[in-house]
A protein has these predicted regions:
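Feature captures the catalytic ectodomains and active-site-proximal regions of enzymes
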Residues: 1-514
Length: 514
């Protein structure tokens, strides 16, 4: 065996950008990363588009990034896969989707479309919603209601109005559908058990309770007038003659077209789980035909999944377990699922010999209020694990560049970058002390571009910029090759450990003899 432990450090949302304007990575004081990039083998890696199984030019994201890293191969994402099925026409024969249609026909009930209405491509894509309108039209379903969840994180903060406008035009063109509610993802797509937020969304959907507006566009505009951007639009019910256009009722069908699970779970559980305890449901549990685009959570009952995931076998974690090696995964709450569930190919169960260390994320409204988040605690746990000599491999994620980058607050993002730099320094020292080795990377860009260079507006989304690949304390005879992507990381780590990569991994090691 080689040096031990081998650490994979993921700096979430830490991209590289030649421009310094609006670039927290360039503006922060980062003596540690500067030194590593100057003195260690360092190249720029690809973390977006086809390199991670997304459509060309599509920004990467944390789920996709960790999936590719853990798989050691390019994993074609749901976005790419579903879009292809729409183009091929297979989409319109999908059994689960037709189950929703048949239920509406049988019970003369309504079809509700839930989902993040944007082209961000991280959680959903608006073209998938358009395909659902087309599906309803082809099957003669007339009562189709869109519940528009606004984005503003993976898209510009005030772009929601245009997405609603485009959706309304598409409904007009296809000849079916109307907007029934509008709400920000802050409420309906929480992932941190903030049930008070989810309850507001649920009550708008089921009771027609909340803010009211005469039309979808009016709902967005009245929020903008109160300085609420897309993400924070209060759940708003569209009313006609003083009554809600539509609410979700017993025997209706719901199709939730988000394909990424983490932020779809809570609201889905509120509808589908007969033993739900998050908050008091005004009407209690009632039966629906609820179709989830993907498997949000196997523990949520009473739903049907439309697109089952392609199994990924022999992930990096599985490979380590099969070789009897001990591994640790650690991160704070916001990214814990990424270093565990997503890194393991979408499998919840830990591998044999896989320990997990979760550090709670701070309970603040938005992370610009505490840009260091829980980085120092994650760092302390990591340093202790390195010194313990207990693990062969440790995988860690620092959430700050991404989570604080999403706020668009440049000053806070700079502080986040500086906090992470300090942590990287402590870990490098611990690695050298233990004679371990480390590979530093990022899963996608974010903090390196916080303004839209054309409009000069805040830019809160991920980017298509390259990310750093840095080799720390490995054999000096080696450097890194250019042109790699996230799928090449696991094969690199396996070679660093003196082992042979499994045939299922099609990525290629980045190590190159000088």
């Amino acid at each position: 065996m080689s040096k031990r432990p081998t650490v994979l450090m993921i700096l979430d949302g830490y991209g590289l950008n030649d421009k310094t304007e609006g670039n927290a990575v360039a503006q922060g004081k980062t003596p540690v990363m500067d030194k590593l990039m100057a003195e260690c083998p360092f190249v720029k890696g690809n973390a977006s588009g086809m390199a991670v199984g997304l459509p060309e030019g599509q920004m990467g994201n944390s789920e996709v990034g960790h999936l590719n890293m853990g798989a050691g191969r390019i994993v074609y994402q749901e976005l790419t896969r579903i879009t292809k099925e729409i183009e091929d026409g297979v989409f319109f024969e999908n059994e689960a989707l037709l189950k929703a249609i048949d239920n509406c026909k049988k019970n003369h009930s309504d079809l509700h479309l839930f989902g993040l209405l944007s082209d961000g491509g991280v959680h959903s894509h608006n073209t998938h919603m358009y395909a659902l309108l087309e599906l309803a039209k082809r099957n003669g379903i007339e009562n189709v209601y869109l519940h528009a969840f606004l984005d503003g994180r993976d898209t510009p903060p005030s772009s929601g109005k245009e997405f609603v406008r485009a959706a309304m035009e598409k409904m007009e063109e296809i000849g079916v559908g109307q907007v029934a509610t509008v709400m920000g993802r802050y409420y309906v797509m929480d992932r941190d058990n903030r049930w008070d937020r989810v309850q507001k969304a649920y009550e708008a959907l089921v009771l027609g309770k909340g803010e009211t507006a005469e039309c979808g566009l009016c709902a967005v505009q009245q929020s903008y007038d109160k300085d609420e951007t897309d993400e924070f639009v209060l759940p708003t019910v569209i009313v006609k003659d003083g009554k809600p256009v539509a609410t979700v009722k017993e025997k209706d069908s719901v199709i939730f077209y988000n394909f990424r699970p983490d932020r779809a779970r809570e609201i889905t559980r509120a509808f589908c789980d007969d033993k739900f305890e998050g908050f008091e449901r005004a009407k209690g549990f009632f039966p629906l035909t609820f179709i989830a685009f993907t498997e949000y959570d196997v523990t949520i009952p009473n739903k049907t999944v439309a697109f089952h995931k392609v199994e990924i076998t022999n992930t990096f974690g599985e490979f380590l377990a099969n070789n009897g090696l001990k591994q640790l995964r650690t991160a704070e709450t916001e990214k814990y699922a990424h270093v565990t569930f997503f890194f393991n190919g979408g499998v919840e169960e830990p591998n044999e010999g896989e320990d997990r260390l979760l550090v709670n994320s701070p309970k603040v409204a938005t992370y610009d209020l505490q840009p260091e988040m829980s980085a120092y605690q994650v760092c302390d746990g990591l340093v202790e694990a390195i010194r313990s000599d207990k693990y062969d491999v440790i995988i860690v994620n620092f959430a700050n560049p991404d989570m604080v980058g999403h706020t668009g607050v440049e000053e806070a993002a700079i502080k986040a970058i500086e906090a992470v730099d300090e942590c990287v320094g402590k870990v490098v020292d611990a690695i050298k002390e233990a004679d371990g080795q480390m590979f530093i990377c990022a899963d996608h860009g974010n903090a390196e571009q916080l303004i839209d260079y054309d409009t000069k507006q805040p830019f809160t989304a991920h980017t298509i910029n390259p990310v750093p690949f840095i080799l720390v304390n490995y054999d000096e005879d080696y450097t890194l090759r250019e042109g790699g992507c996230l799928a090449d990381i696991a094969p690199t780590l396996i070679e660093m450990m003196g082992m042979t990569q499994p045939k299922e991994m099609t990525g290629q090691s980045l190590l190159k003899k000088r």
